Amino acid sequence: MFDLTGMTALVTGASGGIGSAICQALAAQGARLAVSGSNVDKLEAFRASLGGDHVAVPCDLGDKDSVEALVPAALEKLGQIDILVNNAGVTRDNLTMRMKDEEWDDVIRINLEATFRLMRAATKPMMKARFGRIITITSVVGTTGNPGQANYAASKGGLTAMTKAIAQELASRNVTANCVAPGFIATAMTESLPDAQKDALNARIPMGRMGEGTDIGAAVAYLASREAGYITGQTIHVNGGMAML
């Protein structure tokens, strides 16, 4: 696909469904990875499954100190960070009138604030190297909204706007910042849904099916590549035509 040999990447939420597909896509193209997540045992098992000389760097994105320590820890193990993939995120769904403060705060803290802190830390070595790729996984919900997800929509919409601002700040240093916005992606959670519910979801998608994690991984691998060097401040929507934006 795209040759990432000699490049290094830090990926958050690495062992989840979409995160693992992203890591596999980057590793397949030759990148060396620092995989991050909060479940240490699961993370280490995933790192081992990738083969090669990839490294694991655990992090609790809900804890400020843990977030602040992540980029330095990855730099220590990798030597440099060419690619930052902000994939980790959470949901705490509820109707706005019933949403508790902690449900709002948790989503904003992990999805938006932690990503800001990681971007801030990673941009410094990228600017010094005059090369970098920042790729943030957002969501179609960040553009269209979704009932019961005011907190999640706000966090993902905020990531998109923040990416555009950072892209303008870093462009002159050959550092790009872009988003990939998935629609409905098949995961272990969606597989457990009743057939009628899956059929209803698929009916909303012109392509008639959910996407795969590999679809997101391919988009990330492209944006991480040297070939994507003239693309910045953009969002690639990967949703089977569900929302044509």
Model regions: which residues?
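Conserved glycine-rich cofactor-binding loop
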Residues: T8, S15-G16
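Active-site helix of classical SDR
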Residues: M119, S155, T163
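Residue(s) in the substrate-gating loop at a strand-loop-helix junction
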Residues: S139
